[in-house]
Amino acid sequence: MKLAMKLDRPLVVFDIESTGVNARQDRIIELAAIRVEPDGTETEKCWLLNPGVPIPPETTAIHGITDDIVKNCPTFADAAAEIEAFFRDCDLSGFNADRFDIPCLEEEFARTGRNFASGDRRHVDVQRIYHKKEPRDLTAAVKFYCGRDHAGAHGAEADTRATLDVLK
């Protein structure tokens, strides 16, 4: 399925699972991204990351990621160069990305001494688009626009794919 919008540069659709809901202080533990080229070619990547801090049980209850799962994973600093390369010269999209995912990504890059420069990119926040029609969550958006259930909700890979499907 092709995007409804015409791209003049790549678009990265992404989702983050983190240690909490504070984009400025919590840490990324899962980052899934789909890079869509102007010709429609898609490249998917998912990083499972060790946040360097304990994952609160109430957060694990939402996404299922435990300290044991990430204990041998790279930190964000270890993966920063690869993540930066994947996102290079791309516009950004996600569900609630403007209020959470983008600020969270900016903070993680800042902790490594890198400038993510999201202000130089266009943002397509699917939540804003959806809320203009029907104020709900990503699961409701997938049901409404795609006519299917959102299997794997609160998993970054499933949420990223669902966000791209809503965009299409």
Task: Map each language-model feature to its residues.
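Short, flexible loop segments at boundaries between secondary-structure elements
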Residues: 123-135
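Conserved non-catalytic scaffold segment of RNase H-like nuclease domains
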Residues: 1-120, 135-154
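Acidic, divalent-metal-coordinating active-site segment for phosphoryl/phosphodiester hydrolysis
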Residues: 155-167
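Short, glycine/acidic-enriched loop or turn micro-motifs at the edges of active sites
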Residues: 18-20, 128, 162
